[in-house]
Amino acid sequence: MEEDRHGANQGNVPANRALLHALAEKFPNRESVLTQLGLLRAKATLPKGVIHVVSDVHGEAEKLKHIINNCSGGLRSLLEEIFAGKIDQGVFNELLTFIYYPRESWLVRHGQLGAAPARRALVNRLIPREVELLRHVARGYDLAQLDRILPAAYAPLFREWILAREFDRSPEFFAATLENFCACGGELELLRHLARTIRNLFVSELIVAGDFGDRGPRIDGVIDHVMHHANVAITWGNHDASWMGACLGQTACIATVLRMSVRYGRLSQLEQGYGIPLKPLEQLAEAEYGNDPCKCFEYFGPALRNEPLLGRMQKAIAILQFKLESQTIRRNPQFGLQGRDLLPRIDPANGTVEIDHKSFPMSDRNFPTIDWNDPSRLSESEERCLDQFRESFQSSAVLWKQMSYLAQRGAMWLRRDCALIFHGCVPVDGAGNFLPFEVMGSSVSGRKLFHAIESAVHLAFREKDPRVLDLLWYLWAGPLSPVFGKDKLATFENYFVADKEARAETKNPYFHLINDREFCRRILREFEVDVENGLIVNGHVPVKIDKGESPLKASGQAVTIDGAFSEVYGDHGYTLVLQADRTFLAQHHHFESVADSITHGTDIIPTVQVIQEFKPARTMADTEDGQELRAEIAALEALLEAYDEGTVGKAVG
C-alpha cells in the first residue's frame, strides 16, 4: 500500500479475522458499529476541505506569514460575504487586522486604549463577530475533526460558542463566557487562539511545494511560521535538499548554503537564527584574499559587513564549495558529473578554463588556496574553516529541529484530489521518455525514481549514510534530479566566465512538454492520478509574468506556481487553491510590512485565475480521504456481519 503521505491510499482494508478482532475492541457491539458507520457516511457528505499550495518561498518569512494569515485573500472575501452592510469599513479593517495579527494589533491598540473599560469595549466588539466567523468556517467539519483542531485549553469554550445558536443561548450566557478573560487580563491570548483557530479551520491543509530558503531574508522564520500551522505537507525542492544536507554535515552542501547566504546578504539567518558564527569565514577571507578586490563577487541585500569583506567572504566560500563539489563528484562516478569537475580544467598559465570541450577566458586569476597539482585539495586554512562550520551546522539545535521537520513532513510528490504536486519535474528526454538514474545501487525512473529518492532522504536522517548525504548534494544541482531539472548549475561560470554561451543553463524537456496534453496524461498515469481531471502542479521555474507568460500551460493540465515570491526575483507569488467547487490561482503582489498592515489596513488582495470548476461541488467522498472512509466503512460492515453471524464476539442488543 502507498505511503499515506502521498494521499494515494489504494485498495480496501482486508476483512481478515485479526483486523475484525482488533476492530471489535474499539467497537464492542452492534450499536457502536452502527453509530460509527452513520458518522462515517455523514462525514463523506461534507464539503471537501480547502487546500492551499504555495511554492518557492525563498526566505520571505514576513510575506509568507501574511499570505497564510489572510488565507491567500480568502478571509477578506468571506468577511465581505458575512458582514456586507452590517459593519462600517473601520470596524471591518479592525476585525481583519485582529484576525491576521492579533498579538501585534493588541499591542498597538493596548497603548491607545489605556483604561480597562475601553479594552473591554474592543473585546466586546471583536469577539462576537469572530465567533460568527468561527461558526461559519466550522461547518465543513464533523465534531471529531473539530476536537482535533481546537486548541486544548480553549476547546470547551469554542465548542460552546459554535453550538450556542443551536441551543438558543442568551446574550447573558455569551457575556458570562467573556467576563473572566476581561477581568483577569486574558483577552490577548483569547483573541490570539481564536484567530489562529479561524485560520486553521478556513484552510484545512497547507502544502509547501519546496524551496523554503535562500535569496530572501530568513529561512528559519519561514519554517518556524509553517510549523505553527495545524496541518502541513511538504514536497522538497533543491534548496531544501542543500539545507538538509548541510544540517547532516555534507560538506559541499554546507559551503553552498554559506555562499548563498553571503551572496544575498542573509547572514542573520545563520548567526541569529541558527547560532552559526561566521568568524571562521571572515578569518579565511582576510587571510587568503585580504588584498583581492573580488570584483567578480557581487552581493545582493543588506550589507551586514563592509563591502570589501563581503566580496572576499563570498570568494573564499565559493572556492571552497568548488573544491568540495569536485571531491563529491569523484566519490560518485554514478552521478555522471565528471564534466562539471571544473577546477582541474583551469589553465592557470593562460587564465582559461575548458568547459564542454571549449576554452574560455577567465575573469579572475587569483586563486591562492589552489594547489594546481591537486586542485580539489583543501588548504590548511580551508580545512580549519570547514571543520569549524561542520561542527556548527551539526550542533545547531534549531537547524536540526527545522530540518527534521522538513524531512518528516516532506515527500517527493503528493496527490490531493486530482492534483499531482511536486517541486520540479519528472526527468525525461526530448521524446518524453522517463530518464533513469541510479539511487542506492538501483537504476530507477519516473515514479520509482521519486520513491527511491524519498526513501533515501528519510534514511539520511536515520543513519547519515555517506552515499545518501552525497545524494542530497546531487538533488541540489544534478541534471537528473527531479527537484533541479537543468543540464547544469552554472555557478562557476557566472563568477569566472563572461561568455554567455558558457553560462547558459538548459532546462529538462519536461518544462516544454507539459504544454502537450498527451504528455501530461502520461505523467498523470505514471502517478496514478485521474487523467481526465488531473492537474500537474509544480514550482521551481519562475513564471515571467512581466513577459506575458502564463502559469497555466497550453495543455490545460499543468500549472506552474512559482510566481517569483522573492523580491530578488519579482515579488509576486501564487497560491493554488483547491476548493470544493473550483481550483484557482491567487496571484499575490508586493507586501509592505506587518506594521503597515496594522496601522493602515494594507493587505495583499490577490488576482484570481480559475483553473477548474466542479459541478456539483466535491465532497469528502470525492477525495483521498473518501477512499479512506470507504475502506473504514467496508471494515465496519464486515464487523457488523460478523456480529450478526456470531463469528466475532457476541452481538449485544
Protein language model features and the residues they cover:
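Feature recognizes metal-dependent phosphohydrolase scaffolds
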Residues: 1-653
